[in-house]
């Protein structure tokens, strides 16, 4: 006997129930970025996922990036993007545009998408409620010929040094869903642009989040045969970096996951944001859809 659509939906909901109970009143931080941010249909699916998490008793927090949009705005305004060691140099004029794009444009677009589901999202950045303080990032690069390290001056690129969870705890007790842009003040009064992955990791660590999800353009961590690795311990992740299985741009992503776990996150997942409803598939199904990294 063929299953009707209603029967299938009921069966799927019944299967999801244990996971809804597992994550009830738990904090899940989702770093939203990559291809999904530029696709309207994926954006709507993401917003509905976040709304359903909230309706299921989860405390979701969204942190977002916006590198391509920043680059596009700088180009539109005739400002050349400069890079040092593969990292964007952010001068005073650039950081003002970064804040405008991240906190004033992208942030509000995500808030609007979530609000269209009937939930209440609120747009924030690190400046709000003194939530996050940063300091100038100290990055070095090694010269391939001389093997000598030199310090990069990236301008107003920052690193998180302090997270005050007071505002986020207050919002967790409300009906609000925080959507946070990775811009924060320094004790020196400057405004800093912060890598969205590390910003999300710092937020999740300060909240001892049950899960931190990184939405990317890849399925997760792959083995040498190109197959998805479903779960890794921190020690196993270090070993895969050492033997070259984890390479290229996946190295800093995994290192950020490890840092978040050391900061207090119970588990970090790298998953494909190009898959519709990937957040729900990860949280409310038995095996998930990405790579889970645990202590």
Curated annotation (Swiss-Prot):
Catalysis: reaction(s): N-acetyl-L-glutamate + ATP = N-acetyl-L-glutamyl 5-phosphate + ADP
One GO cellular component term: cytoplasm
Gene Ontology annotations of biological process type: arginine biosynthetic process via ornithine; L-arginine biosynthetic process
Alphabetical list of Pfam families matching this protein: AA_kinase
GO MF term list: acetylglutamate kinase activity; ATP binding
Kinase as UniProt keyword: yes
Site (Transition state stabilizer): 31, 253
Keywords: Amino-acid biosynthesis, Arginine biosynthesis, ATP-binding, Cytoplasm, Kinase, Nucleotide-binding, Transferase
Family: Belongs to the acetylglutamate kinase family. ArgB subfamily.
PANTHER family, per database record: N-ACETYLGLUTAMATE SYNTHASE (PTHR23342), N-ACETYLGLUTAMATE SYNTHASE, MITOCHONDRIAL (PTHR23342:SF0)
Free-text function comment from the UniProt entry: Catalyzes the ATP-dependent phosphorylation of N-acetyl-L-glutamate.
Name of the protein this chain belongs to: Acetylglutamate kinase
Source species of the chain: Rhizobium johnstonii (strain DSM 114642 / LMG 32736 / 3841)
């Amino acid at each position: 006997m063929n299953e009707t659509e209603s029967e299938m939906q009921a069966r799927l909901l019944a299967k999801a129930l244990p996971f809804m109970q597992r994550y009830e009143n738990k904090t899940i931080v989702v770093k939203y970025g990559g291809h999904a941010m530029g696709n309207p249909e994926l954006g709507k699916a993401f917003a509905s996922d976040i709304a359903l998490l909230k309706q299921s008793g989860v405390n979701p927090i969204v942190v977002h990036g916006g590198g391509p949009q920043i680059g596009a705005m700088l180009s539109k305004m005739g400002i050349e993007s400069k890079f040092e060691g593969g990292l964007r140099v952010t001068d005073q004029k650039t950081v003002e545009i970064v804040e405008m794009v991240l906190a004033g444009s992208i942030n509000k677009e995500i808030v609007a998408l979530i609000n269209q589901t009937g939930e209440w999202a609120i747009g924030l950045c690190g400046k709000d409620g003194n939530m996050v303080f940063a300091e100038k990032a100290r990055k070095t690069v090694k010269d391939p010929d001389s093997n000598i390290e030199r310090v990069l001056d990236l301008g107003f690129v920052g690193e998180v040094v302090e997270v005050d969870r007071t505002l986020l705890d207050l919002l967790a007790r409300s009906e609000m869903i925080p959507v946070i842009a990775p811009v924060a003040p320094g004790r020196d009064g400057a405004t800093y642009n912060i890598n969205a992955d590390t910003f999300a990791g710092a937020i999740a660590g300060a909240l001892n989040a049950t899960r931190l999800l990184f939405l990317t353009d890849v399925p997760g961590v792959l083995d040498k045969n190109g197959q998805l690795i479903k779960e890794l311990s921190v020690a196993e992740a270090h070993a895969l970096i050492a033997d070259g299985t984890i390479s290229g741009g996946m190295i800093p992503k995994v290192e950020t996951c490890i840092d978040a776990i050391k900061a207090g996150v119970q588990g970090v997942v790298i998953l494909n944001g190009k898959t519709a409803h990937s957040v729900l598939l990860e949280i409310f199904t038995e095996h998930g859809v990405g790579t889970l990294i645990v202590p």
